[in-house]
């Protein structure tokens, strides 16, 4: 490889890492701002209303780029993506954060990369080494142990804890299917088409929620809702997928490990929440398990570095 080519590759990797970090930064604020929004707004309105707003932006993007329509098989797969990242994760985190703190939720969300890898492995029919499964189960056990020992109901899972676990499971499924579909449609178009596909349902639920609980909120709650709509549900995906395309999934994907740490930080700085030592300890254990799943999968020859992410 020539010196000029090496420099070009290096610049691409640097740009990818920067974009990936920007995406993680955007997503790390989702839980704190959801917590702010649901203090004044109905959680169903927050969850589905943000998708409605993002779908308007998605329609504009698809029209401007003249994106071709997905085929029938791709529409079915987009339904899985929509169920996970457009509906499932926003809904269950919104419901959970009406009673739980963002810092508490951050520990649960820390296991998301490992659960995404598990769904990706199952979907692809891969056979990773035993360490992969042990680390994945270990991360989940660490999260459940944390919830049972520190939740509102000692010795049992509270309702908010169940919502958080459902949010992680559905989001992981959506990420895994979306990652595979992005190789065909492109990352930006994948999330945009998922938003468009879900728009009739999200619009109906948003309207019903607005009628049932007329949205009256403070300026801060509306600002948080605007962030969730424009950034968490739309622009954050653009930066994240662009970073993966430029810098490679193996390199840029590691940045996601910083997301729960940043969320804990924002929870303390922006919301004044107390981050207990148990939360920090649990997050460290979960992140260690996530690292083990990624390395075990890579050593088994099934790592994400083999995936080609479209630049579209």
What do the PLM-derived regions correspond to, one by one?
Residues 58, 79-81, 119, 128-150, ...:
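Hydrophobic transmembrane alpha-helices of multi-pass small-molecule transport proteins
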Residues 1-50, 54, 95, 153-180, ...:
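Glycine-/small-residue-enriched transmembrane alpha-helix faces in small-molecule transporters
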Residues 25-31, 59-109, 145, 229-247:
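Specific transmembrane alpha-helical segments of multi-pass solute transporters/efflux pumps
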Residues 2-9, 49-51, 148-149, 221-223, ...:
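C-terminal-most transmembrane helix of multi-pass membrane proteins
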Residues 47-49, 86, 90, 104-111, ...:
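Helix-helix packing/entry segments at the starts of transmembrane helices
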Residues 57-69, 112-134, 261-280:
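C-terminal transmembrane-helix exit sites in multi-pass transporters
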Residues 37, 46, 50, 96, ...:
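Hydrophobic/aromatic residues within transmembrane alpha-helices
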Residues 14-19, 45-60, 64, 80, ...:
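Hydrophobic alpha-helical transmembrane segments of multi-pass integral membrane proteins
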């Amino acid at each position: 490889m020539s010196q000029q080519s090496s420099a070009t590759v290096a610049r691409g990797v640097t740009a990818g890492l920067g974009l990936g970090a920007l995406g993680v930064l955007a997503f790390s604020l989702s839980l704190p701002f959801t917590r702010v929004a649901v203090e004044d707004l109905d959680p169903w309105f927050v969850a589905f209303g943000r998708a409605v707003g993002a779908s308007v932006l998605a329609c504009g993007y698809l029209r401007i780029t003249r994106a071709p329509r997905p085929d029938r098989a791709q529409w079915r797969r987009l339904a899985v993506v929509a169920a996970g990242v457009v509906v499932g994760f926003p809904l269950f985190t919104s419901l959970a954060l009406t009673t739980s703190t963002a810092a508490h939720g951050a520990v649960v969300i820390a296991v998301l990369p490992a659960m995404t890898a598990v769904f990706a492995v199952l979907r692809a029919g891969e056979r990773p080494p035993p360490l992969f499964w042990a680390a994945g189960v270990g991360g989940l056990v660490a999260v459940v142990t944390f919830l049972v020992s520190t939740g509102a109901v000692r010795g049992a899972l509270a309702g908010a804890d169940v919502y958080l676990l459902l949010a992680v499971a559905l989001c992981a499924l959506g990420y895994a299917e979306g990652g595979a579909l992005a190789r065909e449609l492109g990352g930006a178009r994948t999330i945009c088409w998922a938003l468009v596909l879900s728009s009739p349902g999200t619009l109906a639920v948003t309207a019903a929620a607005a009628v049932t609980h007329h949205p009256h909120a403070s300026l801060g709650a509306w600002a948080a809702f605007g962030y969730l709509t424009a950034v968490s549900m739309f622009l954050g995906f653009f930066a994240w997928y662009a970073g993966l395309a430029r810098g490679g999934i193996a390199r840029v994907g590691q940045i996601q490990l910083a997301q729960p740490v940043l969320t804990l930080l924002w929870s303390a700085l922006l919301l004044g929440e107390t981050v207990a030592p148990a939360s920090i300890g649990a997050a460290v254990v979960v992140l260690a398990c996530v690292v083990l799943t990624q390395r075990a999968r890579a050593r088994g020859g099934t790592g994400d570095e083999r995936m080609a992410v479209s630049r579209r």
